[in-house]
Amino acid sequence: VKKEDAQLLLDKFGLSVDPDDADDFHTLLAAVHDCAEDVAKLPDYQPVPDLSRYPRQNIRRPAPEEQDFGQAWAHKFFIKGNADGGPLAGKTVSLKDVIAVAGVPQLLGSDVIPSWTPITDATVVTRLLDAGADILGTSTCENFCHSTSSYTSAQGIVENPLAPGYSAGGSTSGGAALVAGGVVDITIGGDQGGSIRVPASLCGCMIAPEKTIECLADIPRRCWSEAHTWPGSVYRHFKRRCGE
């Protein structure tokens, strides 16, 4: 990184670096560049999902007659949880359509870019399966998760199961509707600005926000400034939350 690089970047915006600050900007850019170079040299970290233990069955975009509450499902499939059981044995789960499941296309609530298909599972998916939960599919989210309503997804509108024709909230719109409507026991979402809290409230569900640091591997961010997400689960009944 050269000392004049900062000014060259700013020229296109009609801005300038104060000469007194030039050395500081050079130090900052050089440090960021060196960090990026070091990271780029690291081997890629790509966890391999256990497809023999947890095979994916019948991955598909649901036909209209398979949908619930408008367009609550992004993709349907079936993954059987741990055969040895676990604390979530017998529970059914849906995942917000920003949580990677190997082999399942992600739509992210948009049609601006083509869907992409992950080749690994998000950490939360592995933990659910190991705990015995059965995963039934991915649920519709709002367009790039930028809405707390339930009508911005390119895949279609999600209706509130308790009040058809009204918003289910967002951006975890499909998941909240599936839980409130009794289709699944639990849904997993992500929240930076109300994306779990709003739909849980509008659909009358319990919310169980995480209090610990979670690994966010294979959960897309909307921008580089989002260094964290607030994962959480949504339940129908208080007794279920307490494990009864």
Please identify what each model-predicted range represents:
Residues 13:
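The catalytic Nudix box helix
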Residues 17-188, 192:
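Gly/Ser-rich catalytic/binding loops embedded in alpha/beta enzyme cores
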Residues 31-34, 38, 51, 155, ...:
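Fold-level recognition of mixed alpha/beta catalytic cores in primary-metabolism enzymes, strongest
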Residues 1-2, 193:
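A diffuse structural propensity rather than consistent per-protein peaks
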